[in-house]
Amino acid sequence: MVMENALGLLAGEWEGEEAIATTRWGEGGPAHGCFSARLDLGGRALLMDYREERDGKAALQAHAVFTAGPGHDEYALHWFDSYGFAPAQPAPGHWDGARLVFLRSSPRGQTRHIYAFREDACELALESSFDGGVHWEPVMHGTYRRVA
């Protein structure tokens, strides 16, 4: 797949339901998520705004910048959220056939973002590891439908 086309799969307005796992960062439960994403810089970057609501109240907000690098299958994710964790470096990513997969690393551990696509739906799974990637814990799973 052409790299810009992979990023373009996320472009649009999306809404869906999420299942948040109980983790060391907080209680689990259902949530409603939505994101708006658009291509920029000639299709080499995707700008995303994400909002999560729990019990009808704003929970997590994030801004993300996805980029397609100069090399084949070279992607990066810059993630900024309302929890205050700014990235020291971008998360490297790759396209594995039907999914965009990114691995964020910080002193707190590692988090995988796995975006899977089908028709007009997108699934996002977040998983965290606190032992260098030996064991992974679910953080969130969301299924989103394109609304525009």
Model-derived regions: residue spans:
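Hydrophobic small-molecule pocket/channel-lining residues, especially in calycin-type beta-barrels
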Residues: M1-A148
